[in-house]
Design a protein with these regions (language model features):
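Conserved active-site and cofactor/substrate-binding residues in soluble primary-metabolism enzymes
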Residues: 19-27, 72-79, 94-98, 122, ...
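C-terminal amphipathic alpha-helical segment
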Residues: 16, 21-33, 37-40
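Buried hydrophobic packing segments
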Residues: 1, 24, 28-31, 99-106
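Single conserved hydrophobic/aromatic residue that forms the stacking wall/gate
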Residues: 2-8, 12
Length: 182
């Protein structure tokens, strides 16, 4: 939301959500800067050194003309998952919930009622703990146990590849910071 509303880019703290280090965003900034590679490189260097950057007025104007932005925190994400499940009988993942919530914000702000399609790229089963809590269930267990619990509560099918994890031994216990991944 900061990129759109104030022209700022900040490193996002949530895992898998650091969209500021993205070749797609770099390409967008490159296009909006008039293909000024030095300017875009400066933004990426500022992001690496200071954790943020502020785009030029020219880029800001291009962003304002092309995009509408909103934000959706964890509480609103959970509320959206729960509401979609209760009202529509449809189980959505955390990423889709953010999209749905921001779409609703957009409609409220603009009056636009055009039909909308969400392309969900994640499964609710990838986020069992969060999804269970969002639909009012206390997660019981971890790993495959949560897959089974979400299935038992909702009747939705566990994705085949996740179901195939039953009985498998954990192969890796290593983790590292993303900056250490060379």
């Amino acid at each position: 939301d900061d990129v759109e509303s104030r022209g700022l880019g900040d490193v996002y703290k949530r895992q898998s959500m650091d969209i500021l280090i993205s070749s797609n965003l770099e390409r967008l900034l490159f296009d909006l800067s008039g293909e000024n590679d030095a300017e875009v490189r400066g933004y990426m260097e500022a992001l690496a050194a200071q954790g943020r950057y502020q785009v030029s007025d020219k880029i800001r104007a291009g962003l304002d003309a092309a995009f509408w932005a909103g934000s959706c925190g964890e509480e609103d994400t959970a509320a959206t998952i729960g509401r979609y499940y209760r009202e529509y009988g449809y189980l959505i993942d955390t990423h889709t919930a953010v999209a749905a919530n921001v779409m609703e914000q957009y409609r409220a702000a603009t009056g636009d009622t055009a039909p909308t399609v969400f392309v969900s790229t994640a499964s609710p089963y990838k986020f069992c703990d969060s999804v269970l809590k969002a639909i009012g269930e206390a997660p019981a267990g971890d790993g495959v146990e949560l897959l089974d619990q979400l299935h038992a509560v909702t009747g939705t099918a566990v994705p085949r590849r996740l179901a195939a994890l039953r009985g498998k031994q954990r192969r890796f216990d290593l983790s590292c910071e993303k900056q250490a991944m060379d």
